[in-house]
Each structure stands twice: as structure tokens, then as C-alpha cells.
């Protein structure tokens, strides 16, 4: 049995908790968030995007009870002061978005956790290894990897298709665009935004060009693609589900039909459950609460010639990503002898 704690009970933290509650190999032993337990229980039970939780949720003064299991809640600003050791937490999911360097994430280890999984790109990629399930997760080293990053939701969508493309046809270079659902960092109406003026515009009113490191980060899990991919984002007024558009040149002359065939083979074989394949006339909300990292849309891509193509792949940027957090932890726990 893998015992986990969650630091930061926002969109990802709550969905990781839902998925953990449904997995008999995982038990949730503690939550840390500055929000009171009564509000955390409410937000866990009712979800505007993924629907209400199917079990029972009751708020207590010092925690929440989910399906008759009491889970203590804490409100510590400094992770080093959390009682992870006393709770027996094997792993901690760091999902505040704040502690993404080695020095800050290490505080969970000082508090007694054995491993830390950051649910975001790391700001110390040279110290903290990045893993994408289905691509390089088996490279986890139980002796050295105490803090790891699960990359971003977009990298989790991009990396599997980039791997299949590079393995089969070779990628010379490529440009990625993610059309990304709005997130909690965006304001509902126009307001100030210190680093990114456009990012301060109303999320529900605008298509907003933005930066993303997701394409470059793919090289952290596929080193052979270093310097070959970059990308940008459009934030759009939808609540959930995003889509990657990858335009690329191939080393090997091929056809769009051959690319689709390679994706279908991978989706039904080595990447089953991670990569999906569809030829249906689908739209974004058809993928709400889809547990896969990336769903290749055969009908949406195009080819210009035998070496220049565009492929399209969908992802539930909340649920699919949260599923991979659990999957990565279970892979690590297997190597650590915990499950």
C-alpha cells in the first residue's frame, strides 16, 4: 500500500485525491492547504467540470472524511513543518505550483516524506529528473531520484506522439501550438498582470496568445529532440480539455496515412492507456474526464508533402494529467518495493 500526502488542494490536488480514493493500491493520509477543511470538503465533493464525487464527503474540524476514511488537513505555509513522517507518508504530491525548485521541494523530505512528485515542470531540471509516463518513466532510479517532476499536462500530451513520430519517421524540427483551456491563474475580467500583460485580460472573453515551455521540455524526456522543438500557446474560453497542434518535418519520406497507422499501432500496443486514437468527428468536451495523456485525432491532421505534416492530439489537461501523477507514483513505488 502506497501512502501519499498532497500539498496544495487545487484543481490537480483534488483530482489526484479522487483518483487515489478509487485505487486500492493508494491511500491518502494527509492534505496541506491554507483553505479551511470545510471549504476543501465542499470543493472536493462538488466539481463544475467533472461532476460531483460519487462517495460520501464530510467536513470535520481537523480534516475531511471521504468514504468513511478520515484524512487530516493542515494549513502550514512551510512544508518542512508538516507531519509527513508521523503520518507515514511515503510520497508527497507537490501541487501548489510554488515549490518547484529542489531547495523548496526538499522541505517535504525534511518533514519525513520519502519522495516528492512535483505536478508541474521543475525549475531545477538539472537536479530534478522529469518523467512522462509512457516515454521515460522506467528510467526512475530508486537510489537517487528523491524529488521528481511529472512535467506539464501539455508535455504529457506532446511527448508520446513525438516519441512515435521520431521512432518511426525521425523528426527534423517542429513547432507546437497548444490551444489550452483557461486555468485558475487567469482573471475573470481584465486586470493587471506584471509579467504578461495579455495574460491579465478576461479569460472568458478572449483568445490569448501565451508562452509555454512544453515543447522544449519534451527534450527532457526525449533528449534526441533537444533543439528540434519549440512552441507557444493560445488560452481559449473553455473550462477544460486542450489540444496540441504539432507541425513538423520528417527525416524519412512518408505519408499522413502511414503516420496515422503508426499512432494507431502504438495506441493499441505499447502506449495503450496513455495514447489514444480516434477517427471520429470529435470536439473538445468529448474528452472531458478522459484518463489518457494524449488522444490522436486522425481526421484533424494534414500533410503538405512527403516530409511536412501537422498532427493534432487532444488531452484533458486536468484529469488525464492527474491520472499520470498516480501512475508515476505507482511505477516509483514498485521500484521502491512499496507495492
Swiss-Prot record:
A Gene Ontology cellular-component term: cytoplasm
UniProt superkingdom: Bacteria
Classification via CDD domains: GAPDH_I_C (cd18126), GAPDH_I_N (cd05214)
Residue sites binding NAD(+) per the record: 11-12, 33, 77, 119, 317
UniProt cross-references to SMART domains, sorted A to Z: Gp_dh_N
Primary location recorded for the protein, binned into one broad class: cytoplasm
Pathway involvement of the protein, from the record: Carbohydrate degradation; glycolysis; pyruvate from D-glyceraldehyde 3-phosphate: step 1/5
Entry's Gene Ontology molecular function annotations: glyceraldehyde-3-phosphate dehydrogenase (NAD+) (phosphorylating) activity; NAD binding; NADP binding
Subcellular location: Cytoplasm
Annotated positions for site Activates thiol group during catalysis: 180
Binding annotation for D-glyceraldehyde 3-phosphate: 152-154, 183, 212-213, 235
Gene Ontology BP annotations: glucose metabolic process; glycolytic process
UniProt cross-references to InterPro entries, sorted A to Z: GlycerAld/Erythrose_P_DH, GlycerAld_3-P_DH_AS, GlycerAld_3-P_DH_cat, GlycerAld_3-P_DH_NAD(P)-bd, Glyceraldehyde-3-P_DH_1, NAD(P)-bd_dom_sf
Family to which the UniProt record says this protein belongs: Belongs to the glyceraldehyde-3-phosphate dehydrogenase family.
Protein name (Swiss-Prot/TrEMBL): Glyceraldehyde-3-phosphate dehydrogenase 1
Species: Synechocystis sp. (strain ATCC 27184 / PCC 6803 / Kazusa)
Amino acid at each position: 500500500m502506497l501512502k501519499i500526502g498532497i500539498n496544495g488542494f487545487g484543481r490537480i490536488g483534488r483530482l489526484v485525491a479522487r483518483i487515489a480514493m478509487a485505487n486500492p493500491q493508494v491511500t491518502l493520509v494527509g492534505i496541506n492547504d491554507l483553505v479551511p477543511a470545510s471549504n476543501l470538503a465542499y470543493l472536493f465533493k462538488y466539481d463544475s467540470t467533472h461532476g460531483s464525487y460519487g462517495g460520501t464527503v464530510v467536513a470535520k474540524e481537523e480534516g475531511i472524511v471521504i468514504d468513511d476514511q478520515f484524512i487530516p488537513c493542515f494549513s502550514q505555509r512551510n512544508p518542512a513543518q508538516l507531519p509527513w513522517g508521523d503520518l507515514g507518508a511515503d510520497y508527497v504530491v507537490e501541487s501548489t505550483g510554488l515549490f518547484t525548485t529542489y531547495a523548496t521541494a526538499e522541505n517535504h523530505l525534511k518533514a519525513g516524506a520519502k519522495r516528492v512528485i512535483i505536478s508541474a515542470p521543475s525549475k531545477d531540471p538539472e537536479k530534478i529528473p522529469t518523467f512522462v509516463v509512457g516515454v521515460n518513466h522506467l528510467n526512475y532510479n530508486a537510489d537517487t531520484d528523491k524529488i521528481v517532476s511529472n512535467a506539464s499536462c501539455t508535455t504529457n500530451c506532446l511527448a508520446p506522439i513525438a516519441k512515435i513520430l521520431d521512432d518511426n519517421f525521425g523528426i527534423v524540427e517542429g513547432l507546437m501550438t497548444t490551444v489550452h483551456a483557461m486555468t485558475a491563474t487567469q482573471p475573470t475580467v481584465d486586470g493587471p498582470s506584471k509579467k504578461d500583460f495579455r495574460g491579465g485580460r478576461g479569460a472568458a472573453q478572449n483568445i490569448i496568445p501565451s508562452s509555454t515551455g512544453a515543447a522544449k521540455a519534451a527534450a527532457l524526456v526525449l533528449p534526441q529532440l533537444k533543439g528540434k522543438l519549440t512552441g507557444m500557446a493560445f488560452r481559449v474560453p473553455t473550462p477544460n480539455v486542450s489540444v496540441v497542434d504539432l507541425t513538423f518535418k520528417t527525416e524519412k519520406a512518408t505519408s499522413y496515412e502511414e503516420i496515422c497507422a503508426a499512432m494507431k499501432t502504438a495506441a493499441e500496443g505499447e502506449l495503450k492507456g496513455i495514447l489514444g486514437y480516434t477517427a471520429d468527428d470529435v470536439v473538445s468536451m468529448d474528452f472531458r474526464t478522459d484518463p489518457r495523456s494524449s488522444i490522436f485525432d486522425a481526421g484533424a491532421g494534414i500533410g503538405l508533402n512527403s516530409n511536412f505534416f501537422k498532427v493534432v492530439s487532444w488531452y484533458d489537461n486536468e484529469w488525464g494529467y492527474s491520472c499520470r501523477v498516480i501512475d508515476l507514483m505507482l511505477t516509483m513505488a514498485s521500484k521502491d518495493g512499496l507495492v
